[in-house]
Amino acid sequence: MALRWGIVSAGLISSDFTTVLRLLPRSEHQVVAVAARDLSRAKEFARKHDIPKAYGSYEELAKDPNVEVAYIGTQHPQHKATVLLCLAAGKAVLCEKPMGVNAAEVREMVAEARSRGLFLMEAIWTRFFPAVEALRSVLAQETLGDLRVVQANFGKSIANVPRSVDWAQAGGSLLDLGIYCLQFISMVYGGQKPEKISAVGRRYETGVDDTVSVLLQYPGGVQGSFTCSITSQLSNTVSVSGTKGMAQILDPCWCPTELVVKGEHKEFPLPSAPGEEFNYTNGMGMCYEAKHVRECLKKGLKESPMITLAESELLADILEEVRKAIGVTFPQDKC
């Protein structure tokens, strides 16, 4: 049976995800509805992607009995309201990262999903790329020896993108880019809570975080560090170092196709998407998380074992603590 998707928001990321779903077997994935706050935008999106139903409100999509799982592609501050709306209507939910602007928002969504017995997952698509799966295998086999250090950085000059510097929309480098670095560190150290967090950063003129460097100490004295920036191009790589060697995820680390282990270079090409254009780098890689959601739902799971709800809460806790350390608060923090 095909998993029936409803797409919440007709923006660029939703377009890429819908393109991917269209390219997957129709016996496994079907997009049955799209909703935008403007009906004309929803209809235009539906025409482009051959979607049978277009709604001018998120409420209408949530009420559609044909929708099994909702993909939330709204702006950061709208995630909580749209996730809660879809959960209240009995839908499974895949929510774009960051799941919430702060830890309280994430906890509220997680509590709602658990109380209703519904599936909820934060769409950290990076976790599902074959290059990252290969890295996990390397770690499981202890190829690198005892792990000591994880270093990651992700920076692009995107201050010209209005959303990236919009304080009201919870822009800035941490929630947009830093979360990718942090999730790598968290993955390597098994979702443990860091014992110590320190951070330095500069703010952009709009009040969002511009460039931030974070140092995390974990149990056993092992470390993780990352730098993220919306005004500077960084190397956009991840390195994991142990007593027997190093592994590197190469640029683009957030959607990687290359892994170097102790100097041995391995490539993991994306599935082909002939004739399709994506808004974001390696957009076809969203197929891996889509397939994962279907597998989880087929098994009757309420959360993903690859990115648990507890880990989503932990990531939100750390990101919020870092923001506080550098003096960045958003309107949602005062609620």
Curated annotation (Swiss-Prot):
GO MF, one example: trans-1,2-dihydrobenzene-1,2-diol dehydrogenase activity
Site (May play an important role in coenzyme binding) residue list: 71, 79, 97
Catalysed reactions listed for this entry: (1R,2R)-1,2-dihydrobenzene-1,2-diol + NADP(+) = catechol + NADPH + H(+); D-xylose + NADP(+) = D-xylono-1,5-lactone + NADPH + H(+)
EC number: 1.3.1.20, 1.1.1.179
Tissue-wise expression: Liver, lens, spleen, kidney and small intestine.
Keywords linked to the UniProt accession: NADP, Oxidoreductase
GO biological process annotation, one example: D-xylose catabolic process
Regulation: Strongly inhibited by isoascorbic acid, 4-hydroxyacetophenone and chloromercuriphenylsulphonate. Stimulated by various salts.
Class of this enzyme: oxidoreductase
Marked site (May play an important role for the adaptation of the alcohol substrate into the binding site) residue numbers: 176
Domain of life: Eukaryota
One Pfam family named in its UniProt record: GFO_IDH_MocA
Site (May play an important role in catalytic activity): residue numbering on this chain: 180
Subunit structure: Homodimer.
Family listed: Belongs to the Gfo/Idh/MocA family.
Name of the protein this chain belongs to: Trans-1,2-dihydrobenzene-1,2-diol dehydrogenase
Phylogenetic lineage: Eukaryota, Metazoa, Chordata, Craniata, Vertebrata
